[in-house]
């Protein structure tokens, strides 16, 4: 089936079922909580640390988001920033980066250190952002290394991938067909996501506010919707009412309490 026909059929499907779905937005969806960069806004924790993953697990987060970079010597390092304390993730050696401390006194962890901690837990999922590289030719190796390590530690079935770059997303979908991949950049419609093989969208709060209809459209296509980064009660209420599947937040306990309150528990 060529792309034009496939797109036409998807749009026909949406036009048929969207009116009914629009009437039930937010109903029946059990929104799940994802701790942004782990649960770090709590005593003794830090962003993208082993502790933040374990603390996310300790409060029952559905998922703990983590950022990973590929270093100059081809080691995967957990950190958000492209440059951290003067060290550029892509051009420095892993030994230099791993010797740098986080705000809670821990050293910057390798990806394997996070996976080792994850293996000791049984519930919380890893929401893994593979970071864009300046050298896109490294994407096949970077994704392949991620896939091998997830299998090595036995946590592939508890991991979901999130990416910004289109080339990186395509490589993840190609190399990890059994793993759900979500798009972060906000520039693809639900129909385009479906066509490219994504499991759903993981879009910034402002993008989803400007395109509320995408939530129902995504659900109609069997896709899921995650939104980031939602930290106030008012905005949490907004996206719960919209019926998103996941909310990524720096305030996971606040969101958990709100969900319990709304369910009457």
What is each model feature region?
Residues 1-28:
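Bacterial Sec-dependent N-terminal signal peptides
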Residues 21-265:
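Phosphate-group recognition and catalysis centered on beta-loop-alpha active-site segments
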